[in-house]
Amino acid sequence: MLSQFPGQCSNNVFCFPPIESETKNGKKASWIICVQVMQHNTILPITDEMFSTDVKDAVAEIFTKFFVEEGAVRISKTTRVTEGKNLGKKNATTVVHQAFKDALSKYNRHARQKRGAHTNRGMIPPMLVKYFNIIPKTFFEEETDPIVHGKRNGVRAVACQQGDGSILLYSRTEKEFLGLDNIKKELKQLYLFIDVRVYLDGELYLHRKPLQWIAGQANAKADSSELHFYVFDCFWSDQLQMPSNKRQQLLTNIFKQKEDLTFIHQVENFSVKNEDEALRLKTQFIKEGYEGAIVRNANGPYEPGYNNYHSPHLAKLKPLLDAEFILVDYTQGKKGKDLGAILWVCELPNKKRFVVTPKHLTYADRYALFQKLTPALFKKHLYGKELTVEYAELSPKTGIPLQARAVGFREPINVLEII
């Protein structure tokens, strides 16, 4: 239970993270709220057992510390907690548990005041997946097993509470969702019981509904929505290095604070010891109607997707789709080693074009092909041919295949013999 509260113990005293502000003179001020457990004038070590069973003759004390840069530390009078609440009921608390809940409430209230009614946190882009249908071996070389959960084919969303107490719900591209009041209402209730600084990362989703329908619901400005918010991660802007397994523990504790939510859910996690176990879970998730699976490096930090950065601590597993498309042109890559390497250009029935990477050609072959293939040779031997393309999914906005790779031509063609 101790791990559900932000902060840490030092010399048997638990201190919440400092809440910092600036004085009128421009100096940094810090406010810290602490909890200690006393028994006959002795400070006891705080244990998880104290959250379920009272210690004889023990009382909990709450106090605050305040200091300004280069100034002395001022310590408040202690507030003593001598008994829990709701005794005899299912939601009864012990002395220690009640003291921590009281301290968290004061901590959150102070944090809101110091942020100010008009001070809003910036949007932090969510962490993006780097690996597709590949699980790095390093994931299994850590002390803690990788984490796997079902991949829902929904709309990515991040939630946080603003300085005025309102809920900000925004997309992967940092666009605010203006509707979804059903979800925001429950988020506001949840934030009454948890650290107000935490960001919740997940997907807007309704099971077995197509992505296009979900996207339409997510972007609607209407107050009502059928969508649910499935949360699979959490993070703090000043603690991005916190490992994934620790974040998952905190996320579980967050959802324990309010268990009567209807539209917000924690995504279930599974630990795996090898790739075969991860692949079996992926197969099971697909049978249940999900898109596939996400694999997380248990010790990986939270790496925001600034500038479309894709984190090497995430992998996505999902079945590939394939179809035939008409080849109409060719081009080259735009940067790095892809510059000068041939790419195929295919066309959809609606005349929209998209680029396809040859899957079975080496870079040396792709360089040679782009250098030697002329428009005349292309028109004579390749234009209008059906190209088999495997891809992850169709874009809900354009219908274009995403992560498209050319497997080969429907009729046997050796493109290297053309040049």
UniProtKB/Swiss-Prot annotation:
A divalent metal cation 2 binds at residue 291. It is found in: Virion. ATP binds at residues 149, 151, 203, 232, 294, 316. PANTHER family: DNA LIGASE, LIGASE, PUTATIVE-RELATED. Pfam families: DNA_ligase_A_M. It comes from African swine fever virus (isolate Tick/Malawi/Lil 20-1/1983). It catalyses: ATP + (deoxyribonucleotide)n-3'-hydroxyl + 5'-phospho-(deoxyribonucleotide)m = (deoxyribonucleotide)n+m + AMP + diphosphate. It is an enzyme of class 6 (ligase). Its EC number is 6.5.1.1. This is DNA ligase. GO terms for biological process: cell division; DNA recombination; DNA repair; DNA replication. Residues 318-419 are annotated as: OB domain. One of its GO terms (cellular component) is virion component. A divalent metal cation 1 binds at residue 203. One of its GO terms (molecular function) is ATP binding. The record marks 153, 211, 402-403 as: Important for the catalytic efficiency. Very low-fidelity DNA ligase that seals nicks in double-stranded DNA during DNA repair. Together with the viral repair DNA polymerase X, fills the single nucleotide gaps generated by the AP endonuclease. It is not essential for viral replication and recombination. Displays a very low adenylation activity towards DNA with 3'-dideoxy- or 3'-amino-terminated nicks compared to regular nick DNA.
